[in-house]
UniProtKB/Swiss-Prot annotation:
EC number, as in UniProt: 2.1.1.185
Function comment: Specifically methylates the ribose of guanosine 2251 in 23S rRNA.
Family of the protein in this entry: Belongs to the class IV-like SAM-binding methyltransferase superfamily. RNA methyltransferase TrmH family. RlmB subfamily.
GO cellular component terms listed in the entry, alphabetical order: cytosol
Gene Ontology MF, one: rRNA (guanosine-2'-O-)-methyltransferase activity
Taxonomic source organism: Acinetobacter baylyi (strain ATCC 33305 / BD413 / ADP1)
Subcellular location: Cytoplasm
Protein name from the UniProt record: 23S rRNA (guanosine-2'-O-)-methyltransferase RlmB
Domain of life: Bacteria
């Protein structure tokens, strides 16, 4: 049996119990804690016969790997890792998929924030390269506040090759967010159909090999003197504009 993963934080554990309770092996709660938020978690766990163990603050910190566990940690059966084949399956019967691809975003806090926004916007999947990218660590899951259980997270071997593949086989329009001579203001782009919005890390932007797969680049107009936004903030603004258009 694979080693369990550990989820921590009230929102993350609540969402897991609501959506995938069968994955929860054991709940660890802080000794002496007895409040409404914890009671809700215990009520969600009870119908499934999930083992609940009281633990010290130090024990919870060791399980979570961080002190910011909010008094609850869940030992969880690992989720299967999704890959290129899962992305193909997702797109086979979908001609209105909206995807978010992150090019070497390495900060788990940024990844978690992007996933949270993607889940709120109803995005079909978040795609990242397997190497040199943040993965779904407990920190990313906590920041996602339940979003990681609501949106598909797909890791691919080569992001540029994957973008080329879904363009050729599923007619996905690849839109890069960067300011170059061909970039359109984001509100001028037509986000209908299958679309992948590609975001780069805020310090390095999109790699040239990723840029080469973009059918169009867009930028977010700003009136201030800032040259760039945090990637999770920019992702939220881009996804909002795409969803605004698609909802009519």
């Amino acid at each position: 049996m694979a080693k369990p993963e550990y989820y921590y934080g009230v929102h993350s554990v609540e969402s897991l119990l609501e959506l995938e309770p069968e994955r929860v092996l054991t709940l660890f709660t802080l000794k002496g804690r007895d409040d409404q938020r914890l009671q809700k978690i215990l009520e969600l766990a009870e119908p499934f016969g999930i083992s609940v163990q009281k633990a010290s603050r130090d024990s919870l910190e060791k399980l979570a790997g961080l002190p910011f566990h909010q008094g609850v940690v869940a030992a969880v059966r690992p989720h299967p890792v999704l890959n290129e084949k899962d992305l193909d399956q997702l797109l086979q019967n979908n001609d209105q998929a909206l995807l978010l691809a992150l090019d070497q975003v390495t900060d788990p806090h940024n990844l978690g924030a992007c996933i949270r926004t993607a889940a709120a916007m109803g995005i079909a999947a978040v795609i990242v390269p397997r190497d040199r990218s943040a993965s779904l660590t407990p920190t990313a899951r906590k920041v996602a506040a339940g979003g990681a259980e609501k949106v598909k997270f797909i890791q691919v071997t080569n992001l540029a090759r994957t973008l080329a593949h879904i363009k050729a086989h599923f007619f996905v329009k690849v839109v890069g967010t960067m300011l170059d001579e061909k970039a359109l203001p984001i509100q001028k782009y037509d986000f209908s159909g299958n679309v992948a919005i590609v975001m780069g890390a805020e310090d390095t932007g999109l790699r040239p090999i990723t840029q080469s797969q973009c059918d169009q680049t867009v930028y977010i107009p700003m009136s201030g003197n800032l040259q760039s936004l945090n990637v999770s903030v920019a992702a939220g603004m881009a996804l909002y504009e795409a969803c605004r258009q698609r909802l009519g």
